[in-house]
Amino acid sequence: MAEVELQGSGPSLQKRLMLICVSVFVGIAIFMLPTPAGLSETGHMYLALLAALLIMFLTEPVPLPIVMVISGISLIVFGIGETRAVWAGYAHPVVFFVLGCLMVAIVAESVGLTDRLGRFILRYTGTNVIRFSFISCLGLGVSSAFMHDIAACAIGIMAMLPLMKAAGINVGSRTGAFLMISLPFCCSAGGMGTLVGGGRNMVSAAFLQDLTGIEITFLDWMIYAFPACLVAVPAVWFACFLVFRPDRTICFIDLTEEQKAKKPFTVDELKALAVVALVFVGFFTKNLHGQDYSIIVMGGIVLMVLIGLVDWRILNAKTEWAVAVLVFGGGIALGTAMGTSGAAEYLASVFFPFFEGKGWLALLIGVGVFAAIMTNLMANIAAAALILPIAIPLAIMEGVDPTIVAMAMGMWTSFAYLLVIGCPPNVVSYSFGYFKSSQLTKAGLVAMPVGMAVLILCALTWWKIIGLV
């Protein structure tokens, strides 16, 4: 049974112009307010622009890639950022990392690996869409702790898409949005489980060591965070389920006897698995060779094309360049400008005094909430560079173990669920067009507090048991 498609081709021209006018009016109104003490004129201009852009993010009067082009142009025209610095964000290493992971997933699909994965999951879940979603989100979410959240998300989506299309789950449908939002959310939540699950974890550990000399090893981080990961992944999935209430009558098409039969891997599948394994080895040994993740994954793509696993023209045609470069790159440029304009530092100076002198739990929640909100707008490296130099000395001054602050930075930023640009898995899933950015925000407003509640519960129970607090 197919669901009725809920979204059309987009708002009418009249509605688009009205939404743009509302966005511009809000931005002008905020800019006309007196500049608060401690905030520069440039920072004030940035916050006014950000307010206008947030309305466009949520209403999409024009496609989101175009909104992010408007963002870059505005940063330059209004003097918030220099031309080269702004456009450099659109070519950030993380952009190429996102592109590379998308391409790896496309290659995995073309050689049949994602189809094999989808059939493997169906054997154990049956055709029920809800059960399939829960098992795949749980498996890929927990796997994200070891294989990087964006890679797990991209491979999972490519395995799920053919099943969704065959079942008649349309773009814009409630069930389609549920499937395509719950997976990146769960992969992001799972990424907190170990140091290699996401760059945010390693950045937080590195800042802690630089500022205090305290080292968090791979095993330390796993002991602190992996139990929370095991609880957060299903909790976030359930939050998405409550928001979208997917149609329980929809089922995937059952496997034929031939499809159920286990077949040996083809030569191309084995070649692809070998290259993917090399890429993951590169991820795990990054501290030894020092190469960026983008270099590792793009090197894998070069190797895949070189050995004939995929035709470049097919790879070029299937890759969502605009979403990766314009949406995620634009988000990085916008986040960088938040730091250089002084707006981020001002917001931190307003926010953190509320949590001073109130103990480790208040500091944990304060750092975590602020970090989770900020990482929706700026890269986690930039957020860590802003927050940890303020929060770690504050923790030491109050007699709180600074490790708690670093863990909060890495773990709470796993819930960047409010905007598409918040984290790479969101961008990857959005690129397939199954949901609007406003739908992701709607789900994030529920899933984000649920994930945070899990982390607070973990701190009050597990961290006390192991003696971290």
Model-identified regions with their sequence ranges:
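Alpha-helical transmembrane segments of multi-pass membrane proteins
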Residues: V129-S144, I169-G190, I216, D220-W221, ...
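Re-entrant/interfacial helical elements at transmembrane boundaries that shape
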Residues: G72, I150-M164, M180-I181, G193-L211, ...
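Membrane-embedded alpha-helical segments and adjacent helix-loop junctions characteristic
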Residues: G8, T35, A52, P65-I66, ...
